[in-house]
Structures are given as C-alpha cells and as structure tokens.
Amino acid sequence: MANDFLFTSESVSEGHPDKVADQISDAILDAIFTQDPRSRVAAETLTNTGLVVLAGEITTNAHVDYIQVARDTIKRIGYDNTEYGIDYKGCAVLVAYDKQSNDIAQGVDHASDDHLNTGAGDQGLMFGYACDETPELMPAPIYYAHRLVERQAQLRKDGRLPFLRPDAKSQVTMRYVDGKPHSIDTVVLSTQHSPDQSETATKMKASFTEAIIEEIIKPVLPKEWLQDTKYLINPTGRFVIGGPQGDCGLTGRKIIVDTYGGACPHGGGAFSGKDPTKVDRSAAYAARYVAKNIVAAGLARQCQIQVAYAIGVARPMNITVYTEGTGVIPDDQIAQLVQEHFDLRPKGIIQMLDLLRPIYAKTAAYGHFGREEPEFTWERTDKAAALRAAAGL
C-alpha cells in the first residue's frame, strides 16, 4: 500500500438489527454460563418486525428463560415502543434450539493429538491485529467509528438529543500521510430519528445536522484531525424506519465491524453466541492478545497474526506473524517467541484469557477489540515485558 492514501472503516450502533441479534445471542450465552460455564453454545438470532427467532445448538445443564433474556436485551437497547417496529413487551419470540452434535462433541472433548487437551470445535483460520495508531493499539478509522455510534447511544439514552432512536451507522475515512494517520477526510453518520426531528432540533436552537456534528462528532474525534473534514449526516434526508423493522437482523453479519474495520484479513467466523470452545471466537481473541502484546513490547509498529485449526485437534496448524516491515527483529523470530510465550491450544486459550465466564454480552456492540474493559482479558499487555526481554531489547 502507498504511504499516502485514504482508508475507511464503519461501525453500527447497538440498535442496528444485526447488532440486536448479536446482543441477544451473547446475552443467551451469558445467562447459560452464569449457571453452567461448561456448556456448549452456538446461539443464533434473527430479528424482524415484531419478531425474534432463537435457534442453534445448546448443550447445558442450565435452566434459562430464553424468551425473557431476549426481551430484556431488546428493552436495554431501547426498543420499548410499538412505533419502533419491535417492542420488548409485545414482540413474538420463537425458540428452536437443538443439542450440539455428538460427532462434534466427541472431537472437542478428546483431542486427537493429545487426550489431555480440548480439541478445536471446528476447522478454520483466525486473525489478530494491533498497531500504534491509537493508545488502544487499534486502527484509527474503526476505533473512532465505534466511538461515534457509542456516543449516539449515550446521548439518546440520557435525553440530551431526544429525537434520536436506536439504529445508527457511522463511517470514518482517514487520510494517511507517510503511512500514519494525518486527518479525517470524511465522516458519515446516519441516525434513526423521530418523525418530528426537525421541529425538535429547532427547539434546541440547532439544526439536526448541526446538533449531530456538535454533540456527537466533534466531542469524539481529535480536533487536530478535523481539517477540511466533510460531514455527511443522514445523506438520504430521512431515517425514521430503522432497526429490525427496516432490515432483518442476523447474528454474525457484522464481522468486520466486530474486528478491525478491514485493516487486516478476516477468517470468516463470527463471534457472538459462541462458547469459547469455538475457535472462531476464542482464537481470534487470543490472536488479538498476541498481536497487542507484540506491539506493546515495541517489537513492531503493527502486527498481524494468523492461526489455523483442524476440528478435534488441539494444536494450531500454523502461527504466522506479519509485521509489514515494521518489526525490529525478523517476523519468523517473533513467531518463535509467540510459540514460547503463548499457549494457543483451545484449552490453553480458555485458561490464559479466563473465558469460561459470563462476559460476552458487553462485547456484542462497539467492537470486541480496543476497549479497556476489565472483563476483556485479551486487551491486557501483561506479556509485553517478557517478550521484549526475550527479544533482547
């Protein structure tokens, strides 16, 4: 990639239909893990106008009121009025869970290469990434796209912008100079609103567009990056019908929003609703943990990790490091350090990151990475010092 370029990432709010589905799936997972952390869960959700469908595979000793969990999640997001197209009190919730396949379970319970270790729950490849563009070691476009829709939800819920409704999308186009973030070229923010938003905004002595720019965008984005920035606020002019009424929502359909905004490859596996024996989730978290510690250690300014697994096999097929020429030691040497300092077998990941806990509902909106939440163990940089010492730095 050239040193001077534009790069864009997007995010969506907790009220986006796909994110509603993700949050319900992870709330189901948390409710199960609260009672039985050894459960096997693959909880999928569909949302549409006035309807929620819960399906997938669950093997557990927990007794969970799945319908109530779904309703509570919809209420927390803010869909509490029939005018919004889905309402936590009146929506239909259909439940259609099966148990995990015995064929899958036997491979996961007993790894073929080492019976003492848990095998991977499926084959697949996962990526982790970190870079020095932000203090959180995330790419700047996705980091700030998340913060925009997060603030939209905050101002909606606390009543400062009462005309806002739950569904929203953001997009940040960053200008890079010499390979580093220089300024923000364009911000797109589309937010659902009440039918009378123009009148309501006028009462606030600001136009709708000005209110969004001044109250949501400018408090979030670094002032020094707002040089001749273009703002596109609700470019279609109207966004009243939204959420599951506007589009059918499905679990796992925002995988780029959930990760790095397109800054690195994605293996294709979604996260929400999956227990950590599913390496789609746990290994992607571990790969972020590895990449972040490498950058925090000063071994590279940016780092991409790929791991791959076979179903029922504990040890990864490969652990590949790519630093795009920013490493202070060769990539193959960094990869060797990874193998020495991180246990990337599924059971090792679960223990290393303490993943058998009800911590997942919080991950399901505003990004799984780059958030300094105490539950997000994959964001720790506790191995950076050891990596730096082992590299002789």
Curated annotation (Swiss-Prot):
Top-level EC class: transferase
Give the location in the cell: Cytoplasm
User: Which intervals of the chain are annotated as region Flexible loop?
Assistant: 100-110
Q: Which UniProt keywords apply?
A: ATP-binding, Cytoplasm, Magnesium, Metal-binding, Nucleotide-binding, One-carbon metabolism, Potassium, Transferase
List cellular component terms (GO).
cytoplasm
Give the cofactor note text.
Binds 2 divalent ions per subunit. Binds 1 potassium ion per subunit.
> Alphabetically, which GO biological process terms does the record hold?
one-carbon metabolic process; S-adenosylmethionine biosynthetic process
Its recorded reaction(s) are: L-methionine + ATP + H2O = S-adenosyl-L-methionine + phosphate + diphosphate
Q: What is its main location?
A: cytoplasm
The protein's required cofactor(s) are namely: Mg(2+); K(+)
**Top-level division of the source organism's lineage:** Bacteria
List residues traversing the bilayer.
none
Q: Where does L-methionine bind?
A: 57, 100, 247, 278
Pathway per its UniProt entry is: Amino-acid biosynthesis; S-adenosyl-L-methionine biosynthesis; S-adenosyl-L-methionine from L-methionine: step 1/1
Any idea which positions bind K(+)?
44
Residues given in the record as ATP binding sites: 16, 167-169, 238-239, 247, 253-254, 270, 274
| A GO molecular-function annotation | methionine adenosyltransferase activity
Q: What is its EC number?
A: 2.5.1.6
Q: Which residues bind Mg(2+)?
A: 18
Q: Which SUPFAM superfamilies match?
A: S-adenosylmethionine synthetase
Described by its record, this protein's role is as follows: Catalyzes the formation of S-adenosylmethionine (AdoMet) from methionine and ATP. The overall synthetic reaction is composed of two sequential steps, AdoMet formation and the subsequent tripolyphosphate hydrolysis which occurs prior to release of AdoMet from the enzyme.
Entry-linked HAMAP family:
S_AdoMet_synth1
**How the protein assembles, per its UniProt entry?**
Homotetramer; dimer of dimers.
Give the protein family: Belongs to the AdoMet synthase family.
What name has this protein been given in UniProt? S-adenosylmethionine synthase
